[in-house]
């Protein structure tokens, strides 16, 4: 039996064929959108997920940080499991680079967060508190996939607290 380690992009090791493909891949400067391989990958991902476009990021750490910084502003907070990469690992990037405050809570043995606890941690709309802006769920935790019904309930909870303030509308 062959062991495949999917814990992290940091433990991925390309085999000979992958290294060979990399050595002959057509490359260019992605800043100028001159890298046909990256363009093809982004186009393929956008089509696969039914989106207008996609963005290639070379690591899970960078992807998680971009997601946090996309959804949160300086001084905001995100609710996250204590074992999640965006909290426990990744050098505290959200706090260090984005001035985003994590609000960690215990994860259940199946990787879920108790949604009652999540709801109790959502801060009131009061300038004395960091604004609760995001619920981060890690899929998978300890190799366990979050159940679809749980994700639906978590999504419903998050959406029920979504609102746009007048300044937010004007900054869009």
Q: Where is each model-derived feature located?
A:
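Conserved core of the PLP fold type I
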Residues: 52-72, 106
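N-terminal amphipathic/basic leader segments beginning at the initiator methionine
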Residues: 1-21
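PLP-dependent aminotransferase-class I/II
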Residues: 98-153
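Single conserved hydrophobic/aromatic residue that forms the stacking wall/gate
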Residues: 163-172
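Aromatic/hydrophobic pocket-lining residues that form π-stacking "cages" and hydrophobic walls in ligand
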Residues: 154, 162
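Conserved PLP-anchoring active-site segment centered on the Schiff-base-forming lysine
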Residues: 70-88
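Conserved N-terminal alpha-helix of the aminotransferase class I/II PLP-enzyme fold
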Residues: 15-60, 82-83, 87-88
